[in-house]
Amino acid sequence: IGGALRHVSFDATPGTMNCANFPASVSTAPVQAMEISLYPTYNVLSKMIFSDTKMREDIMCIGGTSQWPATIFRGTDQWGDPFGYLLVDPIGGAIGAFSDGDGISTGGQSRTPICKLPNIEHTEQTFPLLFLYRKEVIDSGGAGKFRGGMSAESCFIPHGTENITHDTLSSGNAIPTSTGMMGGYPGAVNVYKFQRESNIGEMFNKSTLPADIAEVGGREEILGLRQQNFNQKASDVYSVLWTGAGGFGDPLERDPVLVAFDVTENMAVSIQAAKQIYGVVMANDGTCDVNATQALRSQLHQERMKHPRGENAPALRQLSGKKLQQPTANLCVRLDSEAPPNERKRWSCVSCATDLGSVKENYKHGCALQTLPITASNPHVGDYLRYIDDEPVFRQFFCPGCGRLIENEIARFDDELLVDIELKN
């Protein structure tokens, strides 16, 4: 009852980030250390239960504002009284994709059913703020056969007061924390944006409202993730975008009609992402160009197969033995009657049965590997050097026989290939 998570006990190790010893700082634990422990557990549990065809219906990728970008501000309100507020808007997190359907955009926090996104008018009535917009953000949901839910962005200026004083408090801004699963891409990262001395007053005089902070002129200021006591004046524009949700499965397997609908109706996918990530070519009338899409996807599959494999990768061949198990949507275990007795259980592609190596080894060594900059993981991922020193990369593992995307991973450049699946003999 209640899903797999209720049957899991967390036994944290003292002295670690999620079980800190005194006098370590723990003020952000509820929205950061807790979430960075809890949400990856969803993916672990999902991979554990995928082999069961009934239980896989409960699989859900990471979402729900996987790292909360807090905006804390204070000052004197429109009535001359002191005020303080924590912007609660990121509670409208994105729900991750499922094994058989898309995630839910701004669906709330997946760990609780009682999330309520604040009403903008009520916030403006209570505090000295004027919202320029609050919107769901295109491309913020992780790409996949089933797309992750979109997150949102809130943008405001002071109103009825000369200035307000801010603190930022966040993580998850350099690399995605809402990772996808079984070939799905991650969702957007947290993003703080701040335009000093903008032309927002001139825009108001022309009866113009910006649809995005990028349309506002001014001087861009990069905010730190623990920046304290910075002032926002009436001409300064502030926005915060929170994490999107992870996608499920290979984006090239998504129905092109759904991708076209995401572009034209849902405003969930940009034309550029549709082509570059989903391999879908849009026609001038807003529909999918079927022939061009088929040609592009075929080309992308061919390019995937050309990437190098590991030094110890098995010979390129298809297995004809019995299918024993399917641990993920893209990976299965087959018998190889020609192999030595202790090597007969082999990883293979679920589509073409290409041999990916012994189940005693990491299947990723048998895949074609492409290592990309972290910015390739989601269109909203920016320059990591703003926040961290080690270079993160986006690794993709393809079937060398058919080009199917088996899995993605985010790691530091020098990290060994991550082991995400082991079978108990």
What are these regions (language model features)?
Residues 354-392, 412-413, 418-419:
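Short recognition patches in nucleic-acid-associated and regulatory proteins
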Residues 390-425:
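Short, compact, well-ordered microdomains
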